[in-house]
């Protein structure tokens, strides 16, 4: 047995399934997960000492690469002053100002400790502000594991093959309406059925938990118009896309102004973090200025704020997002070219620093039902082939891939050469 396999068996004795988040268990691809000991730049290193070119990036946060020297130093400096205070700090003020500077729709910001906490709080705020109960989400979109959101959820819940999770009362789920991502008519139908009951729409502007599905032209604009027409709030969940798709997130990339935005991942520089914010009129409805309650022991934690600020400042460098997008395009288009060369049906999507690939005859994948019909066995074969070649992809056909600024010419060339070899073996 490898060291990773030994650790996995040991972990299963004390941790449910041996992991602290289901997708890490490799259930979607089979085999044993790699236990990671360290990471640097574009590489992660497992417990057996093997290096992998990493396209998971801790599921998105590591946009500058692992163990970035400025982020590491910011954390070390912050630790000198203490780990947590449970009181306001200048760091959280600076973080809020930086977020507002980069995302104009966010006039005020509340820091929390996770993406789930951010979306849960934003929905509570939307319900309180509108005095309505129902929310509208999309099949295949994942917004964390709050009860009201695990209804036909994507990501790990999709991999488990469960449309929702046991333990969620029907009385909770009945207030969550689900529509078809990229199909505006399904949203219109729900608003016509519940014209004065829907508090908000929440969506991933680029669906990154059913692989990578960008919005089709007119979809986001149509949602904005419907929210305005029916008095609902538009919540854009940018936990994944925030500061990864562009300097101002997916909303800046596509030119859409939401009422509320949720953030996470990138704004923590690798530390646990989340945030939600939006129009001042709405944000003033949250305690202590308003009646909607929300609180958190570690909200605005100084270590997370220090790491996040260091990363956010680096992301303001001229030309950074253009370079990141070019790298992402090269990987995605390179996968497509290699698959075509060997007669393997493959469709690709990419935007900013995110990419996805689908084993299907379809030219473009735009909907949840199309994702579920892709060739899962081909994905598993490709995944393990790439893993053997030293390339670490997300261990699920329902997860997006991520590039970082640390991925250089060498890593891109080696990844595409590996893909060519794996596709060649699959074609035999």
UniProtKB/Swiss-Prot annotation:
Gene Ontology, cellular component aspect: cytoplasm
Protein name: Glutamate-1-semialdehyde 2,1-aminomutase
Pfam families xrefs: Aminotran_3
Binding partners and assembly: Homodimer.
Family the entry assigns: Belongs to the class-III pyridoxal-phosphate-dependent aminotransferase family. HemL subfamily.
Disulfide bonds, paired cysteine numbers: none
Pathway it works in: Porphyrin-containing compound metabolism; protoporphyrin-IX biosynthesis; 5-aminolevulinate from L-glutamyl-tRNA(Glu): step 2/2
Location of this chain's protein in the cell: Cytoplasm
Names of the cofactor(s): pyridoxal 5'-phosphate
GO BP field: protoporphyrinogen IX biosynthetic process
């Amino acid at each position: 047995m490898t060291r990773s396999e030994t650790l996995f068996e040991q972990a299963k004795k004390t941790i449910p399934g041996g992991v602290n988040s289901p997708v890490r268990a490799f259930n979607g691809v089979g085999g044993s997960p790699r236990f990671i000991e360290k990471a640097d730049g574009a590489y992660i290193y497992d417990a057996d000492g093997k290096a992998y070119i990493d396209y998971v990036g801790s599921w998105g946060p590591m946009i500058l690469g692992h163990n970035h020297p400025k982020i590491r130093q910011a954390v070390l400096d912050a630790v000198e002053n203490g780990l947590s205070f449970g009181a306001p700090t200048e760091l959280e003020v600076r973080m809020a100002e930086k977020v507002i500077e980069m995302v104009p729709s966010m006039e005020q910001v509340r820091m929390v400790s996770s993406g789930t906490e951010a979306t849960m709080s934003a929905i509570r705020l939307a319900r309180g502000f509108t005095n309505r109960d129902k929310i509208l989400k999309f099949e295949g979109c994942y917004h964390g594991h709050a009860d009201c959101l695990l209804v036909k959820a994507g990501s790990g819940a999709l991999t488990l093959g469960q449309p929702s999770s046991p333990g969620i009362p029907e009385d909770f789920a009945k207030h969550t309406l689900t529509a078809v991502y990229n199909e505006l008519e399904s949203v219109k139908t729900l608003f016509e059925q519940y014209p004065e009951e829907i508090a908000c729409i929440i969506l991933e502007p680029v669906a990154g938990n059913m692989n990578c599905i960008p919005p089709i032209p007119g979809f986001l604009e149509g949602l904005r118009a419907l929210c305005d027409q029916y008095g609902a709030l538009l919540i854009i969940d940018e936990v994944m896309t925030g500061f990864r798709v562009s300097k101002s997130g997916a909303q800046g990339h596509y030119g859409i102004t939401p009422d509320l935005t949720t953030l996470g991942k990138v704004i923590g520089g690798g530390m646990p973090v989340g945030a939600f914010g939006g129009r001042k009129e709405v944000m003033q409805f949250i305690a202590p200025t308003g009646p909607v309650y929300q609180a958190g022991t570690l909200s605005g934690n100084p270590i997370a704020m220090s790491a996040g600020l260091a990363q956010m400042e680096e992301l303001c460098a001229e030309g950074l997002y253009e370079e990141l997008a070019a790298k992402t395009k090269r990987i995605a288009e390179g996968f497509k070219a290699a698959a075509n060369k060997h007669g393997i049906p493959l469709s690709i999507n990419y935007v900013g620093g995110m990419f996805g690939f689908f084993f299907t005859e379809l030219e473009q994948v735009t909907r949840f039902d199309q994702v579920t019909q892709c060739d899962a066995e081909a994905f598993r074969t490709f995944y393990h082939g790439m893993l053997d070649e030293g390339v670490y992809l997300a261990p699920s056909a329902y997860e997006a891939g991520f590039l970082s600024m640390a991925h250089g010419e060498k890593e891109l060339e080696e990844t595409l050469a590996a893909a060519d070899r794996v596709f060649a073996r699959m074609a035999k």
